[in-house]
Amino acid sequence: MSQEPPARPDPATLSYEQARAELVDVVQRLEQGAATLEDSLALWERGEALAARCQEWLDGARDRLARVSPASGGATEAPAPAERDR
């Protein structure tokens, strides 16, 4: 019998902060090692979905920053501190 709540929101509907907070909880629960194999697999699957949602948000934020920062020449990464200080 699973210990997961029966009605969890679809990860696609979660904000970055909501998905990340739940992902942190999932990881902590898995690290405790107290769940059954079935529950652990369900937690793992939920964690994968939450991690994918977080990555979608991060990719979208990176794209958005690249669009509004024409001075960067479309670069999506800042120069390393050593290169910036030259």
Curated annotation (Swiss-Prot):
Gene3D superfamilies assigned: Exonuclease VII, small subunit
Record SUPFAM superfamilies: XseB-like
Region (Disordered): 67-86
Protein name stated in the entry: Exodeoxyribonuclease 7 small subunit
Keyword rRNA processing: no
Underlying gene: xseB
Cited Pfam families: Exonuc_VII_S
Keywords: Cytoplasm, Exonuclease, Hydrolase, Nuclease
Source organism (scientific name): Beutenbergia cavernae (strain ATCC BAA-8 / DSM 12333 / CCUG 43141 / JCM 11478 / NBRC 16432 / NCIMB 13614 / HKI 0122)
Chain's role: Bidirectionally degrades single-stranded DNA into large acid-insoluble oligonucleotides, which are then degraded further into small acid-soluble oligonucleotides.
EC class name: hydrolase
Superkingdom, natural source: Bacteria
Self-association state and partner proteins as the record states: Heterooligomer composed of large and small subunits.
